[in-house]
């Protein structure tokens, strides 16, 4: 899964640590999300999108199947 979390996070000058605190996860989770190594739950994806003032569809893209 490809993500645009880092792009949106940088728009708000937000660190990985700050985003993790706001979402309620560890910084490592944000790192794995940004690297595409972790597929989030719907709840986590929704919370990240809400904090970054965007939609889940704008943040996450499925890899070709």
Regions found by a protein language model. Give the residues of each.
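Short basic helix-loop element that most often maps to the first helix and adjoining turn
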Residues: 3-22
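Short, Lys/Arg-enriched C-terminal cap helix and immediately downstream tail that follows
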Residues: 8, 42-43
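Residues within helix-turn-helix
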Residues: 17, 28, 57
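Recognition helix of helix-turn-helix/homeodomain-like DNA-binding domains
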Residues: 25-38
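DNA major-groove recognition helix of helix-turn-helix/homeodomain DNA-binding modules
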Residues: 43-58
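Short, charged recognition helix plus adjacent turn
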Residues: 61-65
């Amino acid at each position: 899964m490809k993500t645009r979390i880092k792009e949106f996070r940088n728009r708000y000058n937000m660190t990985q640590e700050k985003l993790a605190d706001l979402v309620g996860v560890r910084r490592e989770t944000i790192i794995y999300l940004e690297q595409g190594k972790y597929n989030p739950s719907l709840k986590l994806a929704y919370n990240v999108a809400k904090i970054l003032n965007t939609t889940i569809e704008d943040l996450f893209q499925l890899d070709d199947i």
